[in-house]
């Protein structure tokens, strides 16, 4: 990082997580998350009573039980792996300060930025850990960054990396994780790429997320196409985690798994390239819930391929992404 000022920091931002696998902690987290107009666009007078008097009392205990099934000794998997990724990137960016925060929950973005400013940081490269841009995720981080930038005035310069859905090093890292899985377990009958869904109305309103998912899947499949015995036709892209009654991006992951089982498909490998690190949606929804659903529908085995987490290829790819952004900024300074 020769030539870069030591007053520069990298801020990794992930979605967020409850502080504990308990109903009160989950309710606090979901309340903050579901109050974001980027996540739920209903009018506040209609949404807030529904959220606080119906959804949170019902979902709090249910979601807490799901978290309890995947909770790690060090805390929430999402927090543990995000911290590990920040540490791995710090080793690769020794002249910078690498920190991490959550959009919802703790550590809050505002608190981490305040701490960085107290350390003398004057430039912050914000890297939302969402490979694909969406108004429901990345734009919400950008909203907070805009508020923090207004508060900081000229004291801090913010620079956000909006997406990296076809970054060659990231694509190679995901493809490499799939190859490692195949080397240990062999290939399944199908390779399913499962992304978090968004409401179809947002896609209709030109949210780039569906196109980013498709482009990323195609790039990863192309990287795997050189492997002997892999047929790109075995790859399927789906969307998971829908919430509410309105249509979301399709095909749905759960419906696809049931359909594959009905067609006689016995084994499925599932990878989730929309998630930088493992979390509730991968470890519980895919690895436990959807694996059981696939077996109940007649399939034999759903093998979940872990997220990149704090792996060397992941840290290498994101550190290189940061380097390029910093050098591009220095060239135009």
Regions found by a protein language model. Give the residues of each.
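Active-site-proximal alpha-helix that buttresses catalytic centers in soluble enzyme cores
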Residues: 1-333
